[in-house]
From Swiss-Prot:
Entry annotated with the keyword DNA damage: yes
Molecular function terms, GO-annotated: DNA binding; excinuclease ABC activity
Position of the signal peptide: none
Main location as per UniProt: cytoplasm
Any one of the GO CC terms: excinuclease repair complex
Subunit structure: Interacts with UvrB in an incision complex.
Protein name per its UniProtKB record: UvrABC system protein C
Lineage of producing organism: Bacteria, Pseudomonadati, Pseudomonadota, Alphaproteobacteria, Hyphomicrobiales
HAMAP family in UniProt: UvrC (MF_00203)
Keyword Thylakoid part of the UniProt annotation: no
Family according to the record: Belongs to the UvrC family.
Domain UVR as annotated: residue spans: 254-289
Gene3D superfamilies for the chain: 5' to 3' exonuclease, C-terminal subdomain, GIY-YIG endonuclease, UVR domain, UvrC, RNAse H endonuclease domain
Length: 680
């Protein structure tokens, strides 16, 4: 079935270059999810009659009203084939039943339809928003599907502390403060924050670290922070720095730079060359930020610009983000769509899904018009709570901007075609090398990472015809207490057991007798069965892995291959352990060898990154984290009131009750936690 929830134990991979400034917030759900979750569907219940295809749809039409709404089409297995919306459900669905000539895609969908459901909505705009939300959640086979739909990163300047900090942020806006974005990539946010640190000397440490400082850290020494933790700068002076940073991010960059230039010149006139050099370096940092922004049209204050290039069965949609008159990056998308669809149809469906869980700007510019331009504008205006203008510029600065985005879309499309062709050849070579029945469409690569058994993490990365599928990466925190510290075999055994036990429970064991490859990994919701699993390990690891696969009864359902490091652990001398044959090596310049090395190295990188994140979290753990009922808000309130966790532990019950947001019951819980420990 499509549309299952992600497993509770699954952790989506956050593709960030740096994690030091990340704030991870749980509950980053689609803003429109409640809309879909509360839908009261009118089931067709016509599959009991044995009707299929156009005959079933014809019977279903008799029950449909002439009102706007959304309909779903199912196959015999209960998988959602298609989600559509209509101004008139009866007229729209009837088109599938009449004897008109359909495209191959529609004809195939109609033939497979074994059941249908519908729901009415008050307006067509409401139907459009619901349709987009359902397509993203259910990922129906015959719809245009938005891939790589990870949330965008923002810059957060906190507003709940005497010394605001600057962080990279993804997810729900749960913390008080000013959010600036969206940025196209985490790398762009990281570069911007680094430059803003040099320009405005704002802290990037967590509140718990801030409260425990007794002297300035290294960032103060290298002039990347003004040292508010130990009052190296007054609260008023620090507040001015923070306000300047907000002004710069709000588009008032010229005002900020002029103020700094005046201060630099004044310092030079006063012969205070050291202070003048500081202002010079801060100005250079701001110029560095702007140098990475590329094109910055003066007439575009807040807009997203979309351009599509459709060729060779692949569509590339390029998006540029402009906020406060600044270019905050761009990103290329490659939606899954039927090659017979026009570029306008692909773009139309893409736009509704794109803004399902993202803030909508005041203006959206397109490279070409779409059929439902006015309806989309009305729906997005209703969702955003402000007027959204959608236009296709014909001349002037905005047309030049759109042409620039079109050029980027064309270049990204060309690169994608080349990469896809190369990946296809490598997968075919992989098949020949290991004697597989078909070229694998989903390869899962596993690796463990730990230091003497501590903070052990298992990592899983996924590769397919379009490269690495990062939204399918998972990490497994090793939980078993029976594993001897440093026992790699035991750790891999736990990872395999958890991964495939859950998979069997939710998906069942696949029938591999047909020898047909699974769909492209990027198109399948998680969880789904892999064709091949690669294990970073030799004969010992593979013995443990194959024992688990045999115990679960899935030895014939998935091909397990081990990769042992070569002599002296040299790259290029790896030994492979496939099932049912002797181990072997590949020639040093074999493209398949490079392909496997790249997959193994990616699994290694991901596992190490997950381990480091877990270890870092363990190192900076605060004693307040161990108290049940003390979440981030109460923890922050206690630290702001008392300064340090040690001061909290020494506080009297009456002092704890005096903290804003701390009830008597919570205060008593905190007091008992520390004093019960002391008594022991």
């Amino acid at each position: 079935m499509n549309g299952r929830k992600l497993p509770d134990g699954g952790v989506l991979y956050d593709d960030t270059d740096e994690s030091e400034d990340d704030i991870e917030v749980e509950g980053d759900a689609s803003v429109a999810a409640p809309l879909a979750a509360t839908v009261d569907w009118n089931a067709g219940s016509l599959n009991e009659t044995g009707l299929l295809g156009a005959e079933l749809i014809g019977e279903f039409v008799k029950r449909l009203p002439n009102s706007p709404g959304v309909y779903r089409m199912f196959n015999a297995e209960g998988d959602v084939l298609y989600v559509g919306k209509a101004r008139s459900l009866k007229k729209r669905v009837n088109n599938y039943a009449v004897g008109r000539v359909h495209s191959n895609r529609i004809a195939q969908m109609v033939r497979q339809t074994a059941n249908m459901e519908f729901v009415t909505t008050r307006t067509e705009t409401e139907a459009l928003l619901l349709e987009a939300n359902l397509i993203k959640r259910l990922r129906p086979r015959f719809n245009v599907l938005l891939r790589d739909d990870k949330s965008f990163p923002y810059i957060l300047i906190t507003g709940d502390h005497r010394a605001p900090a600057i962080f990279k942020h993804r997810g729900a806006r749960a913390r008080k403060g000013d959010y600036f974005g969206p940025f196209a990539s985490a790398g762009a946010v990281g570069r911007t924050i680094n430059s803003l640190q040099r320009a405005f000397l704002i802290r990037t440490c967590t509140d718990s670290v801030f409260e425990t400082r007794t002297r300035p850290c290294l960032l103060y020494q290298i002039k990347r922070c003004s040292g508010p933790c130990t009052h190296e700068v007054s609260d008023g002076g620090y507040g001015e720095l923070v306000q300047e940073a907000k002004d710069f991010l709000s588009g008032k960059s010229q005002k900020v730079k002029s103020h700094m230039a005046e201060a630099m010149n004044q310092a030079a006139e006063d012969l205070d060359f050291e202070r003048a050099a500081i202002y010079r370096d801060r100005l250079a940092a701001l110029s560095h930020v702007q140098s990475h922004q590329g094109i910055n049209p003066a007439g575009v204050e807040e807009a997203d610009v979309f351009a599509i290039h459709h060729e060779g069965g692949i569509s590339c949609i390029q998006v540029f983000f402009f906020r406060t008159g600044q270019n905050w990056g761009n990103r290329a998308y490659f939606p899954k769509a039927d090659p017979q669809l026009s570029s306008a149809e692909v773009l139309n469906s893409f736009l509704a899904q794109f803004y399902d869980d993202k803030p909508v700007p005041k203006q959206i510019m397109l490279s070409q018009t779409v059929e439902e331009l006015e309806l989309l504008a009305a729906a997005l205006s209703e969702k955003a709570g402000h007027k959204v203008s959608m236009l296709v510029p014909q001349r002037g600065e905005k047309r030049d901007l759109v042409d620039h985005v079109v050029g980027n879309a064309r270049e990204a499309h060309g690169r994608k075609l080349a990469e896809t062709a190369s990946q296809s050849r490598l997968l075919e070579g992989f098949k020949e090398t290991f004697g597989l029945a078909y070229a694998p469409q989903r390869i899962e690569i596993y690796d463990n990472s730990h230091i003497m058994g501590t903070n052990a993490v298992g990592g899983m990365v996924v590769a397919g015809p379009e490269g690495f599928v990062k939204n399918q990466y998972r990490k497994f925190n090793i939980k078993s207490t029976d594993i001897t510290p440093g026992d790699d075999f035991g750790m891999m055994k736990e990872v395999m057991t958890r991964r495939f036990s859950r998979l069997i429970k939710e998906e069942g064991i696949p029938d591999r007798t047909a020898q047909v490859a699974t769909p492209d990994a990027a198109d399948m919701p998680f969880p789904t069965w892999p064709d091949v699993i690669l294990i970073d390990g030799g004969q010992g690891q593979m013995t443990a892995v194959r024992a688990i696969l045999a115990e679960l009864g899935i030895t014939d359902s998935v091909t397990a291959i081990g990769i042992a490091k070569g002599v002296d652990r040299d790259a290029g001398r790896e030994r492979f352990f496939p099932p049912g044959r002797e181990s072997f090596t590949l020639p040093p310049r074999d493209p398949v060898l490079y392909f496997i090395q790249r997959m193994r190295d990616e699994a290694h990188r991901f596992a190490i990154g997950s381990h480091r994140a877990r270890r870092k979290k363990e190192m900076i753990k605060n004693p307040l984290d161990e108290i049940g009922g003390i979440g981030p808000s109460r923890k922050r309130a206690l630290l702001q009131h008392f300064g340090t966790a040690k001061a909290v532990s020494r506080a009297a019950l009456s002092d704890l009750m005096a903290v804003e947001g701390i009830s008597e019951a919570v205060a008593r819980q905190v007091y008992n936690h520390f004093h019960d420990d002391a008594a022991k």
